[in-house]
Amino acid sequence: MKPSKHLIFALFALAISQPTMAAPQPIDRVAVQINDGIVLESEITNMIDTVKANARAANQSLPSDSALRTQVIERLILTRLQLQMADRIGLHIGDLQLDQAIENIAREQKMTVAQMQQKIESEGLSFGQYREQLREEITLGEIQRIQVQRRIQVSPQEITGLVKLIQEQGMKDVEYQIGHILIDVPNNPNSEQLEASSKRANAVLERLKSGEDFRRTAIASSSGPKALEGGIWDYMNINEMPTLFAEVINGAKKGDIIGPIKSGAGFHIIKIMDARGLQTKEIEEVRARHILLKPSPILSEDRAKAMLEQFLKQIRSGEAKFEDLARQYSEDPGSATKGGELGWAEPSIYVPEFAQTLNSLSPDQISEPFRTTHGWHITQLEERRKTDATDQFNTNRAHQLIFRRKFNEELQNWLDEMRADAYIEVFQPESNRG
């Protein structure tokens, strides 16, 4: 089984906060102010050290320390802004939900939580730090989902159009790994600023065409969302990638460099890093039902979980039926009246904890109570089926592809807006001050 993305991210993120060995450390200082929050110099230094260590392990070259520092600061700024937003709306990942996530990760890794803790600590990492980094990762995922999802509308006409296109042309059976560099422009730029950005973009393009390493160039020059990852986006089908990418790469081949392409954000350079056939043309769908209880000032976390445990006993003993309890108690208005039925769907459309739980169940099996950002659930997996993503392309699949494309686009818009509205001040290190 592939390593869990949660585990990989958390192990990577934990390394950021690991102190170097016993050399004396200078007194820490405030490096960045972000609204009423701060970033410490030690946080920047530790993240730079981690990026360098990962680059050495991957035999990857990096740009200058100053360019790398700029990208690290930008990543920390965006992270802090999202966490501040989560705090403002009262989004907090409690210990019970965190424990559930850790149990799911351990299950994916085919080990117990104790074994996973031992593995993490054997690599010199603190399990407590792992928990807090994972809590932050879950928070970021949830605040993005909450804030971005409500900005997205997928119209019936868009779905019908994509279904028709797929039926006429067939599902594009190629996935592309895209490299992206954005040379940004200021808000409301004048002609001189546009010209300056255009010249920078063309200079970057010439360096790339002369053989300069793309990842190193992206870290040094890009203002795009994946800059610190060398500008590399994961494999995407053309129907789910951002519109800007999809419009220019159709028919392109591995190694092609395209651009600069002008948009409202600036000038884009795109490279086809790799292209491959779709890994599978079949998708797995599940039919499930659930009961949701939402903790509140009246219903505590422990009480909600205990009620679901009691429901579970009643269902297993035959004293009550799942659908009857769902109609009576579930607080999911979309499914309660249908006995908790969620219908056929890909597990990936649900929040991660729900999807992970469904993936761990056998048909007819009912889960133990588990926590998501929506509240406490029990769910029953009723059936699984595989459908052909090319021959049986349906409206649900079309909606998912359009939604993913729009989510990537709106996520960046949301981050840009938050950054533009924030008070941000970067304080230069003493050694850089004139």
Curated annotation (Swiss-Prot):
<dbReference type="Pfam" id="PF09312">
    <property type="entry name" value="SurA_N"/>
</dbReference>
<dbReference type="GO" id="GO:0003755">
    <property type="term" value="F:peptidyl-prolyl cis-trans isomerase activity"/>
</dbReference>
<feature type="signal peptide">
    <location>
        <begin position="1"/>
        <end position="22"/>
    </location>
</feature>
<keyword id="KW-0413">Isomerase</keyword>
<keyword id="KW-0677">Repeat</keyword>
<feature type="domain" description="PpiC 2">
    <location>
        <begin position="283"/>
        <end position="383"/>
    </location>
</feature>
<comment type="function">
    <text>Chaperone involved in the correct folding and assembly of outer membrane proteins. Recognizes specific patterns of aromatic residues and the orientation of their side chains, which are found more frequently in integral outer membrane proteins. May act in both early periplasmic and late outer membrane-associated steps of protein maturation.</text>
</comment>
<dbReference type="InterPro" id="IPR023058">
    <property type="entry name" value="PPIase_PpiC_CS"/>
</dbReference>
<keyword id="KW-0732">Signal</keyword>
<dbReference type="InterPro" id="IPR023034">
    <property type="entry name" value="PPIase_SurA"/>
</dbReference>
<keyword id="KW-0697">Rotamase</keyword>
<protein>
    <recommendedName>
        <fullName>Chaperone SurA</fullName>
        <ecNumber>5.2.1.8</ecNumber>
    </recommendedName>
</protein>
<keyword id="KW-0143">Chaperone</keyword>
<dbReference type="GO" id="GO:0042277">
    <property type="term" value="F:peptide binding"/>
</dbReference>
<dbReference type="GO" id="GO:0043165">
    <property type="term" value="P:Gram-negative-bacterium-type cell outer membrane assembly"/>
</dbReference>
<feature type="domain" description="PpiC 1">
    <location>
        <begin position="173"/>
        <end position="274"/>
    </location>
</feature>
<dbReference type="InterPro" id="IPR027304">
    <property type="entry name" value="Trigger_fact/SurA_dom_sf"/>
</dbReference>
<dbReference type="InterPro" id="IPR046357">
    <property type="entry name" value="PPIase_dom_sf"/>
</dbReference>
<keyword id="KW-0574">Periplasm</keyword>
<dbReference type="InterPro" id="IPR000297">
    <property type="entry name" value="PPIase_PpiC"/>
</dbReference>
<dbReference type="InterPro" id="IPR015391">
    <property type="entry name" value="SurA_N"/>
</dbReference>
<dbReference type="InterPro" id="IPR050280">
    <property type="entry name" value="OMP_Chaperone_SurA"/>
</dbReference>
<dbReference type="GO" id="GO:0050821">
    <property type="term" value="P:protein stabilization"/>
</dbReference>
<dbReference type="GO" id="GO:0030288">
    <property type="term" value="C:outer membrane-bounded periplasmic space"/>
</dbReference>
<dbReference type="GO" id="GO:0006457">
    <property type="term" value="P:protein folding"/>
</dbReference>
<dbReference type="GO" id="GO:0051082">
    <property type="term" value="F:unfolded protein binding"/>
</dbReference>
<dbReference type="Pfam" id="PF00639">
    <property type="entry name" value="Rotamase"/>
</dbReference>
